[in-house]
Design a protein with these regions (language model features):
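Conserved alpha-helical substructure of the radical SAM core
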Residues: 1-79, 86
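Non-cysteine beta-strand/loop elements that form the S-adenosyl-L-methionine
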Residues: 99-110, 129-133
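A short acidic, amphipathic alpha-helical/loop segment
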Residues: 60-67, 89-94, 115-120
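Acidic (Asp/Glu)-rich catalytic clusters
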Residues: 38-42, 91-98
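Short, positively charged
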Residues: 27, 136-150
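Accessory C-terminal segments flanking Radical SAM cores
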Residues: 144-194
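Basic phosphate/pyrophosphate-binding loop/patch that engages nucleotide-derived ligands
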Residues: 113-129
Length: 194
């Protein structure tokens, strides 16, 4: 679930294309309505991932996350963060006893609040997983590749994100790259993509 296109970093070749967003924005207004629509029409969703950009750049990240959890308290919710921003105590208090976890990608010195974030999450009993930013995958660039149908199928089959659906701007995409390329209007709108 993309809750913002704002990011505290500007990574070249970002898999979610955040470097291409000129007017970055939060996408609060329809998120919970879209999540409810999906939840009402899918038998079981074991996990939601709250992403961005950097999700903590959305000042309403805690309320949105709580809204996702409240729709089904048994599902796990993971917030993917680069630990440049430490969540505030008052934001984390509402997650006591909730099935919330943080996935912290460690970019070394760029993740300037990593230690503070881990201490704060520990203090509130919120689980987290810290992983170094290794194995960087250059998903592609926004350009016409002129691939054959056979080659397109092969690229999709080899993609590391084929089982990660992306909810952005009220649409559920089967590919995070396509989701952001479409949201940027860098490619034509194609209903087959969502």
């Amino acid at each position: 679930v993309v809750i913002t296109t704002k990011c505290s970093m500007n990574c070249e070749s970002c898999a979610n294309l955040m470097q291409y967003y000129k007017s970055q924005k939060n996408t609060d207004s329809e998120i919970l309505k879209s999540v409810k629509l999906i939840s009402d029409n899918v038998d079981h969703i074991s996990e939601y991932r709250i992403i961005g950009g950097e999700p903590l750049m959305n000042k309403n990240w805690a309320e949105i996350t709580k809204g996702v959890i409240d729709q089904d308290p048994n599902r796990s919710v993971y917030i993917y963060s680069n630990a440049t921003i430490c969540p505030k105590d008052e934001q984390l208090e509402m997650f006591k006893g909730k099935n919330l976890h943080f996935y912290l990608t460690d970019y070394g010195d760029l993740s300037r609040n990593m230690e503070k974030t881990m201490k704060t999450l520990d203090k509130h009993g919120i689980g987290f997983y810290r992983k170094p930013a290794g194995n960087w995958v250059d998903c592609s660039g926004i350009k016409k590749h002129n691939r054959s149908v056979k080659k397109l199928r092969q690229v999709f089959k080899e993609c590391c994100a084929t089982e990660l659906y992306t909810l952005i701007s009220g649409k559920l995409y089967t590919c995070p790259f396509i989701a952001n390329a479409a949201n940027l209007k860098a490619i034509p709108d194609n209903k087959a993509d969502y």
